[in-house]
From Swiss-Prot:
Catalytic activity, EC: 4.3.1.17
The organism of origin for this protein: Helicobacter pylori (strain ATCC 700392 / 26695) (Campylobacter pylori)
Gene (UniProt): sdaA
Cofactor: [4Fe-4S] cluster
Name this polypeptide is given: L-serine dehydratase
MF (Gene Ontology): 4 iron, 4 sulfur cluster binding; L-serine ammonia-lyase activity; metal ion binding
Cofactor binding note of this UniProt entry: Binds 1 [4Fe-4S] cluster.
Major enzyme class: lyase
Taxonomic placement: Bacteria, Pseudomonadati, Campylobacterota, Epsilonproteobacteria, Campylobacterales
Amino acid sequence: MASFSILSIFKIGVGPSSSHTIGPMEAGARFCESLKGILEQVVRVQITLHGSLALTGKGHLSDEAVLIGLHGIYANELEVTTKKALLHEALENKVLKLANQHHIPFDYAKDLIFDNKPLTRHQNALILKAFNSKNEVLKEETYYSVGGGFVYTEKELDNLSEEDGNESIAYDFSSAKELLELCQKHQKSIAEIVRLRENALKNHPDATMVKIYHAMLECYDNGANSKERYLPGSLKVTRLAPSIKTRLEKHPTSGKDPLALIDYISLYARAIAEENASGGKVVTAPTNGACAVVPSVLLYAKNHLFENLSQKAINDFLLTSAAIGYLYKKNASLSGAEAGCQAEIGVASSMAAGGLAHLCQATTQQVLIASEIAMEHHLGLTCDPVGGLVQIPCIERNVLGAIKAISASKLALEDEYKPKVSLDEVIATMYATGKDMNEKYKETSLGGLAKTLKC
């Protein structure tokens, strides 16, 4: 496997879920690639969604995602018109154009299985099988969607464990402590260390962050200016961002209310989270369910804190945030199905707090303190999406995650602030808490608000 890029914490894809939509779509597309040489022999495919993918798969559009992937399409390539046409062909006409080349019959009721029982390696798993005319299995693969749009086969998961101990990457780090030491040794900021690391891997950190930033802006614009009244699904949740935007344009907040800027943060976060919930184009940050926290804090900084924020400063914010997200991916989880919403909104808030602290001229130590504070006050947060949809409580959690990130950043900048808990310690605590959490509260829609609220 190629060396892990910190830049991949941010991925351009589609909503509503990175683990349940982007991941299954990638699994389907990769399975198509594995059929090269035997594609014409395939007469049927079977999809089995396991664990959380089965329990919340319909609300998260996992079923539709894997079907689109089996056409050889990845989430960053998908257009809305293409999506509608492919799903109509597969679900209404019962024909699947495998790898966008080979037509086979498809029966949703028989060929797509929802198995609530999780596999042992991760709560989000899917098994894909291809059969020939004799009903023999030509190819079978198990994929694990581990959060943030990252997908691995069984073999790749094994290789990940081996690489952790064997791989040597310039300017790499495995903990916040190591990151701090790197910054001090080279007299560089976190963003600069990430640049050095990614350049050593022949990646293009600044060009990539420009692309990510513009995708975030596009997502905000689409959500804030949507003409749709309701989000899709049975809950009939009203899109609130367009009306907030209209109100703020007509009646900008005055200086009388010291907390008036919260309305703008709500606008930014709701617009992006609502666009994600509608299945629109989004950026994982680090997941789709938490996609609005980082960009809404960035928009707050750009539009209200700093005049003429440069593209380099924006890139620095994103690279700093990505470094924090990388620590959670490496040492804990980005999956609500594995560790609850603390692994999604909590991580996003931690990332955004670190990024904002950097923009506010924080030291590296203060950046890490800000990230720690933000996570500390998300510990134990459950993932209980009502109806399996990424709407209630997910959208408003993005708003509050952004507000907490801003508060954490401000706290960390206090000269007399002396932390008792390190970022490494809170990351370990989050993961342990997630492992201890009852499965009902880990993206199964079997507990919490998902059970209390009847839809």
